């Protein structure tokens, strides 16, 4: 665990060319405890500073765990850093583990509406204090810049904190992937002539967070 760091960023838009990073958050394990560290841009001129501080911190880790980070967070960090002439080798030298990419097969198995972080949290009954979206936080950040209201500052930090805390908590979903690789044992079956259906019951040794029962054509797993 000491080599892992969970990453989530908050931005003012979707493209680095017209947007900026206003918050970088990291969760890491140290001395038998989980810790959260956040770098907040309290003005439009402090983005470079938080990037430099974050890069100094991240060089101590070997794996970055994110949610859709390989598509969004990491490229965004690199492009924003490049705009300031910062060296981004530290990100290239760290392995990336994108939970979103690895959990794609789980969406169909669990019959999820989508693969958003909030959907996965709901499936696992993970509660969070913040209910707003990242898009809604952009307006909150701009309001903070105009007013300096510390309550808005806390709202921004909480949103990022809840996202960060969710990342380690959804990792047990990866165990569903082992279902496809494990050995199955026939536990029983029944044939119904009334409904013209065959039910097959199999045992799987994989431990998963929530039991799964799925109906397939001609059988039930």
Language model feature labels by segment:
Residues 1-7, 14-19, 29-221:
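DEDD superfamily 3′-5′ metal-dependent exonuclease/proofreading module
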């Amino acid at each position: 665990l000491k080599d892992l760091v969970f990453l989530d960023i908050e931005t003012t838009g979707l493209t680095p060319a017209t947007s900026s990073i206003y918050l970088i958050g990291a969760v890491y394990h140290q001395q038998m405890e989980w810790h959260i560290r956040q770098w907040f841009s309290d003005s439009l001129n402090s983005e470079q500073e938080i990037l430099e501080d974050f890069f100094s911190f991240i060089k101590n880790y070997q794996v970055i765990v994110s949610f859709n980070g390989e598509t969004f967070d990491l490229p965004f960090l690199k492009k924003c850093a490049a705009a300031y002439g910062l060296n981004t080798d530290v990100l290239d030298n760290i392995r990336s583990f994108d939970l979103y990419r690895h959990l794609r097969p789980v969406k169909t198995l669990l019959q999820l509406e989508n693969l958003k972080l909030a959907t996965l949290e709901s499936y696992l009954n993970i509660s969070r204090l913040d209910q707003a979206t990242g898009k809604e936080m952009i307006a909150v950040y701009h309001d903070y810049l105009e007013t300096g209201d510390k309550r808005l500052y806390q709202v921004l930090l909480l949103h990022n904190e809840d996202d960060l805390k969710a990342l380690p908590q959804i990792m047990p979903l990866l165990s569903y992937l082992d279902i496809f690789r494990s050995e199955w044992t026939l536990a029983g079956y029944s044939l119904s002539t009334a409904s013209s259906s065959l039910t097959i019951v199999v045992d799987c040794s994989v431990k998963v967070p929530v039991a799964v029962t799925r109906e397939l054509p001609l059988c039930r797993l």
